[in-house]
């Protein structure tokens, strides 16, 4: 292991001890924001510290095994060889693990998200598929213990959605779903197809981290135009009685957001402003990623909505992620929310990409 990495790890261990002490102080416990931020930092440092302690122990075991090789007892020498082999394997594994743990963290990884699914080419079938995608992400969120709420929805004429925007909140939502942005293509025989022909449709998915005050996304009130209108669609007795739905236009960028799912105009406005901040934050992230991709190839993390990232082929029961050439014949399970078999390989590919960049530098 490089001396620079060891020095970095030593400084993180010292910081871990410092944060641990701070979390026990009365003035920190009484300040919810400070306590929350320090708790997050502690939980991030904990696995690094544990892995480094294990690594240090493996180095000590290796040294002890080397000394035992000089013993005259053949049985002890054989035991030393086994311990040396085990220690070397542990050292190799932990060096790889520590490299991953030391990768620069995406500052938005802990963020909640806005998930936007929009029907593309394919007419009614695209709308139906956008509904299927929403169910897939809803079931995945449920499995992870996250909460999901609809912010805005425009229903398709024969089911599904022309567009649906939801908010998903919980632990590490953005870190798991950030690579879902892009064009999702479906190949299947629609229920209305009498000839049994396979149709191809597409939906676009956008995953945006929910921007809060710490992101520094400040919106000048003079830069927005707020319109009210009557909510449409499902909603029972409250629908069309009052102009509670809100549309906000950000004049400098032309970004438009709507919210009509909440019962009051005040709540809809707050939700729409939060969504607008997230869209502006995502635009900034997209800009940074484009600048990075100009200097290096990043297959996984481009987040370009027009890029076809995945195909769902129903006749073959196949799902293919084109960015990492991953094909799984378990489409039914995936559509029921079993997404980890796709998401985890994407995360590993992204980590490998970051490691390659660090070694190039």
From Swiss-Prot:
Keywords of this entry: Cytoplasm, Methylation, Protein biosynthesis
SMART domains named in the record: PCRF
Record's comment on post-translational modification: Methylated by PrmC. Methylation increases the termination efficiency of RF1.
Domain of life: Bacteria
InterPro entries from the UniProt entry: PCRF, Pep_chain_release_fac_I, Pep_chain_release_fac_I_sf, Prokaryotic/Mito_RF, RF-1
Region named Disordered: 287-307
Compositionally biased tracts (Basic and acidic residues): 287-297
Cellular component terms (Gene Ontology): cytoplasm
PROSITE patterns assigned: RF_PROK_I (PS00745)
Pfam families assigned to the protein according to its UniProt record, in alphabetical order: PCRF (PF03462), RF-1 (PF00472)
Cell compartment(s), UniProt: Cytoplasm
Modification sites for N5-methylglutamine: 237
GO MF terms, alphabetically ordered: translation release factor activity, codon specific
Protein family per UniProt: Belongs to the prokaryotic/mitochondrial release factor family.
Annotated function: Peptide chain release factor 1 directs the termination of translation in response to the peptide chain termination codons UAG and UAA.
Name of the protein: Peptide chain release factor 1
